[in-house]
Amino acid sequence: APECGREAHCGDDCQSQVVTRDFDDRTCPKLLCCSKDGWCGNTDANWRCGVDFGRTCPNDLCCS
């Protein structure tokens, strides 16, 4: 799973809440971590979203 950092978001519906630089898995599951680099994820896996992230993974699992 990607590391959450500054300006990272988490949430499986992308109604995402901002998490702090000191990521805490009590705030959100690491597998639902999204960052400005375009990570998307579900409870099974994380993978990198490309520019066309809507075609790479479901929109409801993506943040940008």
Curated annotation (Swiss-Prot):
Function: N-acetyl-D-glucosamine binding lectin. Shows low hemagglutinating activity towards human erythrocytes. Has low mitogenic activity towards human peripheral blood lymphocytes.
Keywords for the protein's UniProt record, in alphabetical order: Chitin-binding, Glycoprotein, Hemagglutinin, Lectin, Mitogen, Repeat
Name of the molecule in the record: Lectin-A
Organism ancestry: Eukaryota, Viridiplantae, Streptophyta, Embryophyta, Tracheophyta
Keyword presence, rRNA-binding: no
Species whose genome carries this gene: Phytolacca americana (American pokeweed)
A GO molecular-function annotation: chitin binding
GO BP annotations listed: positive regulation of cell division; positive regulation of mitotic nuclear division
Residue span, Chitin-binding type-1 domain: 1-20, 22-45
Family matches, as SUPFAM superfamilies: Plant lectins/antimicrobial peptides
InterPro entries: Chitin-bd_1, Endochitinase-like_sf
PTM note: Glycosylated.
